């Protein structure tokens, strides 16, 4: 009995001790620094608690945790009864951070109202509207912005803001808010601004004009705004490396130079997500007025910089600004999509994919083909196929295995078809507007070099099989007018290389000529189909993109050593072009930028300082080893092999040199590709001028429309009976876009269904039309 009592007593004692321990733990309240930063040890129990900052946190979570910690310390945020020993990462992120956001949002809105400038006006009465109209009448230029329900095509304007710089007054006109506050009717508000926006004598300044232009044009009252400039695009001309071109981001970064010293809060920071229609007008008008106020001020600051740089002024106001109306026309015209063909093709692809899935289940039993690990284990482990890519199952690795195993060949075809179906054939019809056309966008700010980029969808990536869903409207064809070997013509102009000049001027095969010079062989031995021509072509095009020996080797299926030899032969055999490439490197190292033929800059602002630092490291390495890092890198084909150099010094030299060499490789490409981008943009402007005149004397069903630009190709919607003289004029406009020592050439083809049954100019004009 005593034994049993002792056991019970021991059990009771243990429970008492546990209860006391829990009480001790509960009674200790760590400091905020311990909870967030250092972690803490309960002095009574010795138990270690990790800090919230020491946990695995994303960058976004780190910023939120830091904000909460600082707010708690400053008293901006309270714990609201939460004991510090109960503070967890979840509590901080899901409870305290939202509270902090709400507090700061309320403070920002209060500050916005309290500091609202006296020249910011809410226009919600007839007298206020009349005052605005009278003020605008005296202004040769105004800033304009719209506030909308969202950013899609179907979203609508809920109000617009106008800044009048001479009067120094700023207006917001609401008419579709849902907050129940006083507003004027939409027809009244839009009817007074329509003649102003459509007046070619009044300059309109906007930030991201394409968005606002579409909203005005497709509104119920259809306002076609003309004579405008875009401060977002001007900023791109001034600095193609900006992290963000959003107005508030630019104002926060540069505002101190044009009168805005405080941070400019974004819409989401002030009002959260959702459309502007839900924003209280009494607050929203201040935000909206500031938008156009900022836009005008930013524009004046940009003009000051552009006036000091005539070449960039030319890029901005002779190329980029005139291009915007052309791109808008292209966007509004769009592609005619054959919905019936798309649906039938989708069914056909689905049937093919289903059949392939049955085949693949036999070749890859019980394997999840979406699992790279399972696929690799089966191919290289079970089947023992050659493993030349460290277990990779990417496209390149599978291509090498296709001849070894039939299942891999089917798998490659399967992936190709599933991508075609899921990326293009299924989603493209869903993007069609109510007019039955697909309205893609051409982004003039989409690349660092100045080339145009296709978006929503990216027509440049659409494979030929998917392009067949684009069919020209009744009585029309698609004319593809493609600059032939544009990069090479530009490289010839930039360098003055006699080899390129002679080949292009005479019409000889440029790749055979380059091969002959590279290998010191008669041109007869370097014709089409020879390995010399293939290697020279790869090297010529590769040098324009800064290709490394590894890339060259991969493209022609040789070793890296042979790839290096191909490049060496090319550079040695073509010294003038090589000198131009090196000149670009020197310009980047010295001044931090290169220029296109038209004067567009591609900036590498950090490189000159890094080159100086690399030179210092070179001398440090030379003092220790007798050779510079550059010499070691060249001799050993990689400085990492130079064990005589201390690791830290070697590593620093390697990473710095890698960044510099990347900029060097990009520099010649920037001058060549950037010049090509400028030429394509000017060609679009000139073609649009020609078509605008041509269409004046033609019925609408015979009108010419530019519908897209894909790389160096302009795609034009033309009538089926297009005359040869119009074709020749289109060719002339493109080939003579800018004066070059060797006139460029174009390749033309005509399609009813894009990329299907292409016909030449001669066939078209003789009545041999392509089939749908």
Regions found by a protein language model. Give the residues of each.
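Short hydrophobic/aromatic beta-strand micro-patches
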Residues: 715-719
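Nucleic-acid-processing active sites and adjacent nucleic-acid-binding tracks
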Residues: 166-204, 335
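Acidic beta-strand-to-loop metal/phosphate-binding motif
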Residues: 143, 201-209, 480
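Conserved beta-strand -> loop -> alpha-helix junction used to position metal-binding or nucleic-acid-contacting
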Residues: 223-240, 247, 507-511
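Polymerase palm active-site segment centered on the conserved acidic dipeptide of motif C
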Residues: 219, 342-373, 568-586, 721-772
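Conserved pre-motif C helix in the palm subdomain of viral-like polymerases
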Residues: 290-297, 665-688
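Short active-site loop/helix that positions an aromatic residue
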Residues: 151, 210-221, 234-238, 377-382, ...
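Conserved "right-hand" nucleotidyltransferase catalytic core of DNA-directed polymerases
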Residues: 2-48, 56-61, 66-72, 77-179, ...
């Amino acid at each position: 009995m005593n034994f049993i009592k002792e056991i019970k007593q021991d059990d009771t004692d243990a429970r008492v001790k546990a209860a006391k321990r829990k009480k001790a733990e509960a009674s200790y309240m760590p400091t905020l620094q311990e909870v967030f930063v250092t972690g803490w040890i309960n002095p009574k129990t010795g138990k270690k608690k990790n800090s919230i900052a020491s946990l695995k946190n994303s960058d976004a979570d780190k910023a939120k945790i830091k904000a909460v910690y600082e707010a708690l310390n400053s008293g901006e945020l309270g714990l609201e009864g939460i004991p510090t020993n109960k503070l967890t990462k979840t509590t901080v992120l899901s409870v305290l951070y939202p509270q902090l956001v709400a507090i700061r949002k309320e403070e920002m809105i209060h500050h916005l109202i309290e500091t609202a400038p006296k020249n910011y006006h809410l226009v919600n009465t007839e007298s206020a509207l009349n005052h605005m109209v009278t003020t605008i009448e005296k202004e040769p230029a105004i800033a304009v912005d719209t506030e909308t329900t969202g950013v899609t095509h179907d979203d609508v304007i809920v109000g617009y803001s106008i800044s009048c710089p001479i009067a120094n007054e700023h207006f917001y006109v609401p008419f579709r808010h849902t907050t129940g506050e006083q507003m004027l009717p939409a027809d009244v508000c839009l009817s007074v601004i329509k003649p102003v926006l459509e007046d070619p004598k009044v300059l309109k300044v906007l930030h991201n004009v394409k968005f606002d232009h579409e909203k005005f044009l497709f509104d119920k009252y259809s306002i076609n705004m003309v004579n405008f400039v875009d401060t977002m695009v001007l900023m791109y001309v001034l600095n193609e490396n900006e992290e963000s071109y959003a107005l508030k981001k630019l104002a926060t970064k540069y505002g101190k130079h044009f009168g805005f010293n405080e941070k400019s809060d974004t819409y989401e920071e002030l009002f959260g997500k959702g459309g502007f229609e839900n924003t209280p007008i009494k607050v929203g008008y201040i935000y909206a007025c500031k938008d156009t106020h900022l836009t005008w001020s930013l524009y004046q600051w940009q003009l000051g910089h552009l006036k000091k740089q005539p070449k960039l002024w030319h890029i901005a106001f002779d190329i980029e600004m005139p291009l915007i109306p052309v791109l808008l026309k292209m966007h509004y015209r769009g592609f005619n999509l054959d919905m019936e063909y798309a649906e039938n093709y989708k069914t056909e692809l689905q049937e093919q994919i289903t059949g392939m899935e049955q085949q693949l289940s036999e070749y890859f039993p019980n394997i999840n083909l979406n699992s790279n690990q399972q696929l690799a284990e089966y191919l290289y482990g079970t089947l023992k196929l050659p493993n030349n890519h460290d277990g990779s199952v990417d496209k390149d690795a599978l291509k090498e295995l296709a001849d070894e195993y039939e299942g891999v060949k089917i798998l490659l075809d399967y992936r190709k078809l599933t991508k075609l179906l899921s990326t293009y054939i299924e989603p493209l019809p869903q993007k069609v507007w109510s007019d039955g056309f697909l309205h893609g966008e051409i982004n003039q700010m989409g690349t660092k070099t100045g080339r145009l980029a296709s978006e929503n969808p990216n027509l440049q990536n659409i494979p030929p099989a998917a392009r067949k869903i684009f069919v020209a409207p009744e009585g029309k064809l698609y004319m593809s007018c493609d600059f032939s070997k544009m990069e090479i013509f530009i490289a010839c102009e930039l360098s003055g290389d006699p080899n390129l000049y002679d080949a292009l001027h005479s019409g000889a095969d440029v790749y055979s000529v380059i091969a002959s010079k590279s290998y010191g062989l008669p041109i007869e031995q370097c014709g089409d189909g020879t390995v010399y021509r293939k290697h020279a072509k790869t090297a010529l095009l590769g040098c324009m993109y800064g290709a490394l020996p590894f890339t060259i080797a991969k493209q022609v299926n040789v070793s890296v050593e042979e790839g290096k030899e191909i490049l060496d032969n090319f550079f040695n055999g073509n010294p003038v072009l090589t000198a131009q490439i090196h000149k670009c490197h020197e310009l980047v190292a010295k001044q931090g930028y290169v220029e296109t033929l038209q004067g567009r800059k591609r900036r590498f602002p950090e490189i000159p300082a890094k080159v100086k630092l690399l030179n210092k490291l070179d001398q440090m390495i030379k003092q220790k080893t007798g050779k510079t890092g550059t010499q070691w890198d060249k001799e050993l084909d990689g400085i990492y092999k130079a064990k005589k150099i201390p690791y830290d010094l070697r590593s620093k030299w390697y990473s710095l040199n890698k960044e510099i060499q990347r900029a060097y490789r990009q520099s010649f490409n920037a001058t060549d590709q950037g010049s090509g981008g400028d030429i394509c943009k000017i060609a679009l402007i000139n073609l649009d001028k020609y078509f605008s005149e041509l269409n004046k004397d033609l019925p609408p069903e015979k009108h010419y429309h530019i519908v897209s630009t894909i790389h160096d190709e302009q795609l034009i919607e033309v009538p089926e009976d297009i005359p040869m003289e119009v074709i020749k004029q289109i060719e002339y406009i493109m080939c003579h876009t800018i004066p070059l020592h060797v006139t460029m050439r174009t390749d033309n083809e005509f399609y009813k269904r894009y990329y299907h049954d292409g016909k030449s100019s001669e066939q078209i004009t003789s009545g041999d039309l392509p089939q749908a």
